[in-house]
Amino acid sequence: KRSDRETSNGCVLVKAVDGFAAMIAVKCETDFVANGKDFIAMVQEILDAAVAAKAKSLDEVKGLKLANGEDAAATVQQRSGITGEKMELDGYNFIEGENLSVYDHMGKHTLATIVQLNKKNEEAGHKVAMQVAAMKPVALDEASVPQEVKDEEYKVAIQKTKEEQVEKAVVAAIKKAGINANLVDSEEHIESNINKGWLTREDADKAIEIKKTVGAEKAANLNENMIQNIAKGRLNKFFKDNCLVDQEFQFSDGDKMNVADWLKSQDKDLAVVAYKRFTLSAE
């Protein structure tokens, strides 16, 4: 059944005209269709109509009338019928305002970005649009990260830190007992190392007992302040890796600096205001 088939190929196009930038994605099943000029021309026509209408949603785009007298959604379905491939008009992003830069990654029509700066600077805008493509930020800055994402990341960081502290104590106790901790790091390894003669059953039992008792004891006596401080450090690293302005800028000729500082180095008042990114590939 065509509706059950996977649409992992397609075409993403992006365009900016007079203070309005938009990108659109139409998915299909094979790169043969995705790279066909008729398919790309159809996506371009839908994008042109969306930009001309300054469309504000995917639903609005689907309803736009094209040159054939049909709306965009029907046109995609007709093309699907002609090629025999499932197709979906399923991605639309836009930014309205001045100082917009658009980027089609390597001209391959599979990944596109839009960036808006607070001042006109085409070269800087282009480089930041490339940064967004390469480094896939999840938010503009720390304040833009949804609270539930922050809470979840912090929770994961706390859990990971606790597990590491317990593991550290267990490994130290196993070493102190004169046992090689690498030989007893999992039940599977324990059995295989006994069979190879690298580990005695007695040492294995001792290590299992240490894991149980020292692990439980350490877990019950963790230093909460220390755990929270380490977790906060991890959360800050998450912001640094995932917030556009805090990411290390990838296209600087000189010193390492984050995106916000690089923009200031080009013009002390220059800053990024917004961005959009869409890709066909799973990341």
Protein language model annotation of sequence segments:
Residues 1-283:
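N-terminal assembly/interaction segments in proteins that build large macromolecular machines
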